[in-house]
């Protein structure tokens, strides 16, 4: 209990905060974060912790606590990080078209008439890239009209902003319109942390997590640890923000950031642009981080002003200068610290098949020969949510102009994807689009396109067994991700390096040191690229048809239609609640090696089934490699009959045989797609037992009523085989104790010959997650509460 003096302190500061900031109305499109409310919460935290120094991430998280005094009870903050579950109130939700379908189908089951927080839908994942916007956009709209109509009707019914096809990529639009210093938001996409480039805490989640925020249900997050990255020096020449994160990925690996928020600090931060910081935060997903963020800078202020949000910058100035809200306290403690000298960074090339295989450009040529990677580069692609800012494009076009002046054009197919209609229109006004097209580049629609596998590639077939090399400025490069071909090697790097490589077409080419032979026999060498942080003439609005109603009101008269015969959309049937007994399953599959969400629930051609759980479940784990046979997408019934993996899952579901999958480290790495949890649940999966999980996927499994367990002893992975019976021994007791049983589950393994043994497994279930499990899913649980209100 606070003393009367402390209660007076908080009350007095509440009045101060309220008077310093513009009032935040219930207008769902308010751009200014609720600073007065956040600072009042922070005051309470400061009192409880005896004014302990806080990191920026802690300030933003704790200021969004539903009940600060209940959540933070100790001045020792080290007992919270990595241990305590926080109940949070996010400020907004953003959803892309592929994941929004399932999120909204789940939201519909709650019976609410509007969302509890501002929300937006962005149609970017379902647009195919092939011939350019003029042809690709109408074709993609026609193909996906049913889905777009469904999403738009949901938006109208519930008062959600609807950014239609062609408007841009979700993360670029969020940065341009919604992200703000100190904001906390959720997004149904793993690269939602892109918004951290503007000082927000933005976290990628599955649709069921988004429904928490949409329904006003406190959203739960295990308090992350804080990884501090100290930046010194200044980027120069060819080095870019992309190289900061590709280098960091090499240092930390794809799971080195799991359980952490990455917070950047140091004098080097002030030398970066806002969009450069967004690039760095975007690919924090590739190291497994919960999210990434930057302290408020002058670059943020410039970007806010350039995107018509001067009032946000003014309020942020007050929050920083009067209350020190938007930066870490002086003596804030990080759980780990990594230092990177920006002045010493050289361009990096990451890949193939994993975003953490990082190679400095000076070593790439030699390494590519040693590894026998294809030396001919077959395509160059720039853009994506990671690198489609005006600054990126202006630096790239500087290289294009240099080459054009020398009489050179790209020697391989070269694709450009603008991040938004605002970016595209500004590039068009400034003549940059014309320069790209005059020099052989194909400018695609404002959408994800090839980055998410929506690439109708003609020069290489999906079934080609020959390896080929592409260079992209994307963020992820798993097998078959971009063009459906498992033998395409995607090397991730900056858009500047991609562009230069497109003029050479040779993996041995290093644009920092090498020249290209001209037809006249002379040598041409690129000079380091130059560009503008922001357009000198300001941003161009672009075509009105690509902008939504900015302040939509919910309309309960709008009918949301789902055709029962549709193969694209399907209303959800609730999963059955837990029966109160121990789980007894058979091991269906033992997975070997990397198993990302692309392996578990592939995108590409499967994106069209995102709103139809039954149909998309036919792709479950089709990319997984069977540890026992080395085969991909092969599993064997108890009698030895061969099936594809989802085929066996369906058979066992029909037989009434629940199943378990065994896997290795970082299971579920990659995107936020909850279908990777929904489909196994739909097909009868009850347990996932792995060496370690990626954060988002583990949460998604819990939300859908699947029990995620990790080996207490990793060597036990080697003791289990497909066909074994796996049953829990103390699940009932664990649930009776609301998960507080020491975090262990005893698991009995019985071999086909009757031999049995017991192993220890670990769980991370909170009380709320236990309630989800008992109800059958989080949506069942929320629905039960709503019906009883």
Swiss-Prot record:
The fermenting yeast S.cerevisiae has 2 aconitases, ACO1 essential for the citric acid cycle, and ACO2 specifically and exclusively contributing to lysine biosynthesis. In contrast, in respiring filamentous fungi the ACO2 homologs (acoB) seem enzymatically inactive and the ACO1 homolog (acoA) is solely responsible for these functions. Catalyzes the reversible dehydration of (R)-homocitrate to cis-homoaconitate, a step in the alpha-aminoadipate pathway for lysine biosynthesis. Its EC number is 4.2.1.-. Keywords: 4Fe-4S, Amino-acid biosynthesis, Iron, Iron-sulfur, Lyase, Lysine biosynthesis, Metal-binding, Mitochondrion, Transit peptide. Its cofactor is [4Fe-4S] cluster. [4Fe-4S] cluster binds at residues 385, 448, 451. Substrate binds at residues 96, 189-191, 476, 481, 610, 672-673. Changing residue 610 to R: Reduces catalytic activity towards homoaconitate by 45% and increases the activity towards aconitate by a factor 116. Disruption phenotype: Has very little effect on growth on nonfermentable carbon sources. Induction: Constitutively expressed with a small induction when both glutamate and lysine are missing. It catalyses: (2R)-homocitrate = cis-homoaconitate + H2O. InterPro entries: Acnase/IPM_dHydase_lsu_aba_1/3, Acoase/IPM_deHydtase_lsu_aba, Aconitase/3IPM_dehydase_swvl, Aconitase/IPM_isomerase, Aconitase_4Fe-4S_BS, Aconitase_4Fe-4S_dom, Aconitase_dom2, Aconitase_mito-like. Belongs to the aconitase/IPM isomerase family. The lineage of its organism: Eukaryota, Fungi, Dikarya, Ascomycota, Saccharomycotina. One of its GO terms (biological process) is lysine biosynthetic process via aminoadipic acid. Pfam families: Aconitase, Aconitase_C. This is Homocitrate dehydratase, mitochondrial. Residues 1-14 form a transit peptide. It is found in: Mitochondrion. One of its GO terms (cellular component) is cytosol. Binds 1 [4Fe-4S] cluster per subunit. GO terms for molecular function: 4 iron, 4 sulfur cluster binding; aconitate hydratase activity; metal ion binding. Pathway: Amino-acid biosynthesis; L-lysine biosynthesis via AAA pathway; L-alpha-aminoadipate from 2-oxoglutarate: step 2/5.
């Amino acid at each position: 209990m606070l003393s009367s003096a402390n209660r007076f302190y908080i009350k007095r500061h509440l009045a101060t905060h309220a008077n310093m900031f513009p009032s935040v109305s219930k207008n769902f499109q308010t751009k200014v974060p609720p600073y007065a409310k956040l600072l009042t919460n922070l005051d309470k935290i400061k009192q409880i912790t005896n004014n302990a120094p806080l990191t920026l991430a802690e300030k933003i998280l704790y200021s969004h606590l539903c009940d600060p005094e209940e959540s933070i009870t100790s001045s020792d903050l080290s007992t919270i990080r990595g241990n305590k579950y926080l109940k949070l109130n996010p400020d907004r939700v953003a959803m892309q078209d592929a994941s929004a379908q399932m999120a909204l189908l789940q939201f519909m089951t709650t019976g609410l008439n509007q969302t509890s927080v501002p929300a937006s839908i962005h149609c970017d994942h379902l647009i195919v890239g092939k011939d350019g916007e003029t042809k690709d956009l109408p074709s993609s709209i026609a193909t996906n009209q049913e889905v777009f109509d469904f999403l738009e009707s949901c938006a109208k019914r519930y008062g959600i902003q609807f950014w239609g096809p062609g408007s841009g990529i979700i993360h670029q639009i969020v940065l341009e319109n919604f992200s703000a210093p100190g904001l906390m938001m959720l997004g149904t996409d793993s690269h939602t942390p892109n918004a951290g480039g503007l000082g927000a805490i933005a976290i990628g989640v599955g649709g069921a997590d988004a429904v928490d925020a949409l329904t006003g249900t406190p959203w739960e997050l295990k308090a992350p640890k804080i990884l501090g990255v100290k930046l010194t020096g200044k980027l120069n020449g060819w080095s870019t923000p992309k190289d900061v994160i590709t280098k960091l990925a090499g240092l930390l690996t794809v799971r080195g950031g799991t359980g952490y928020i990455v917070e950047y600090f140091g004098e080097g931060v002030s030398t970066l642009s806002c969009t450069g910081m967004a690039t760095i935060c975007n690919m924090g997903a590739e190291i497994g981080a919960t999210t990434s963020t930057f302290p408020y800078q002058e670059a943020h202020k410039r970007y806010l002003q350039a995107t018509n949000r001067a009032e946000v910058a003014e309020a942020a100035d007050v929050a920083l200068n009067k209350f020190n809200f938007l930066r870490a306290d002086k003596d804030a403690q990080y759980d780990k610290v990594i230092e990177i000298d920006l002045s010493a960074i050289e361009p990096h090339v990451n890949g193939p098949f994993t975003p953490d295989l990082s190679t400095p450009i000076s070593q790439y040529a030699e390494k590519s020969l040693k590894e026998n990677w294809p030396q001919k580069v077959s395509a160059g692609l720039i853009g994506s949510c990671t690198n489609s800012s005006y600054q990126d494009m202006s630096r790239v076009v500087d290289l294009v102009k240099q080459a054009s002046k020398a009489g050179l054009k790209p020697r391989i197919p070269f694709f450009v994807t603008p991040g938004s209609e605002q970016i595209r229109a500004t590039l068009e006004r400034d003549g940059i689009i014309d320069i790209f097209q005059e020099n052989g580049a194909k400018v695609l629609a404002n959408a994800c396109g090839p980055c998410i596998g929506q690439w109708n590639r003609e020069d290489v077939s999906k079934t080609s067994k020959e390896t080929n090399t592409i260079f992209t400025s994307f963020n992820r490069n798993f097998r078959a991700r971009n063009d459906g071909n498992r033998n395409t090697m995607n090397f991730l790097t900056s858009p500047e390096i991609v562009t230069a490589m497109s003029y050479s077409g040779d993996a041995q080419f290093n644009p920092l040191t090498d020249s290209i032979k001209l037809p006249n026999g002379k040598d041409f060498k690129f000079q380091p690229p130059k560009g503008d942080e922001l357009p000198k003439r300001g941003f161009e609005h672009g075509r009105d048809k690509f902008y939504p109603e900015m302040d939509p009101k919910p309309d309960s008269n709008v009918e949301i239609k789902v055709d029962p015969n549709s193969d694209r959309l399907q209303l959800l049937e609730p999963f059955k609640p837990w029966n109160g007994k121990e789980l007894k399953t058979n091991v269906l599959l033992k997975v070997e090696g990397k198993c990302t969400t692309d392996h578990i629930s592939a995108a590409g051609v499967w994106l069209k089934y995102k709103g139809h759980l039954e149909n998309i479940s036919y792709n479950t784990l089709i990319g997984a490699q069977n540890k026992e046979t080395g085969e991909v997408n092969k599993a064997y019934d108890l009698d030895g009959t061969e099936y594809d993996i989802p085929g066996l899952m369906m058979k066992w579901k029909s037989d009434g045989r629940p199943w378990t999958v065994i896997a290795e480290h970082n299971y579920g790495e990659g995107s936020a797609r909850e279908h990777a949890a929904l489909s196994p649940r739909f097909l009868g999966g009850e347990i996932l037992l792995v060496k370690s999980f990626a954060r988002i996927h583990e949460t998604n499994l819990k939300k859908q009523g699947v029990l995620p367990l990790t080996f207490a002893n990793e060597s036990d992975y080697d003791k289990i085989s497909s066909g074994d019976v796996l049953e829990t021994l103390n699940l009932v007791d664990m649930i009776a104790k609301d998960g507080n049983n020491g975090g262990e589950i005893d698991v009995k393994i019985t071999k086909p010959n009757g031999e049995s043994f017991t192993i220890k497994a670990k769980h991370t279930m909170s009380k709320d997650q236990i309630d989800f499990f008992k109800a059958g899913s989080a949506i069942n649980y929320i629905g039960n509460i709503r019906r009883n209100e």
